[in-house]
């Protein structure tokens, strides 16, 4: 390429393109033309841009849709629930949320998750089925955010199964009690008839 003063120039950058003159030593004479494009690298500051969250297995980096700045994250990570089952939530639902709302929402969800796990730890077979159903659906929601819900969800499902088994056992027990009561009633009536028949025979003598 020639400059306006007539002197021959080396590589010249124009609008993101690297233009090399045919006579320049770096000219690519492979038949692809006198110009070749060189992709420019652009580096973005991840702290200033919202990145789409990606989950991963242990050892892989997780990109969050916000920057952690709240002190509460250290409290969450030191909690017994996190120590028992390490958590790596990535909050995909917050990918397109404004950063100023994303982190507080994620912190709220994390605190709620810890509370739910501790609540389930204290549940028993007497817990109402309606309450167990609510927690079952809640943990499914947490799972969509990247939380490991295998343990608490298993506890909820186990309690639901135990409640069903106990309800079935009670139903069978009531059925047996009713059957025994019916048999006893029939036997009692039969004894009454036998006694009456015996008395009639004695009277006839």
UniProtKB/Swiss-Prot annotation:
Region described as Disordered: 28-59
Observed effect of gene inactivation: No visible phenotype under normal growth conditions.
Free-text tissue specificity from the UniProt record: Expressed in roots, leaves, stems, flowers and siliques.
Chief place where the protein resides: nucleus
Keywords associated with the record: Growth regulation, Nucleus, Transport
InterPro entries: DUF724
Domain DUF724 residues, every copy: 63-189
Entry's Gene Ontology cellular component terms: nucleus
Subcellular location(s) per record: Nucleus
Intrachain disulfide bonds: none
Transport found in the keyword field: yes
Coiled-coil blocks: none
Role according to the record: May be involved in the polar growth of plant cells via transportation of RNAs.
Protein name per UniProt: DUF724 domain-containing protein 4
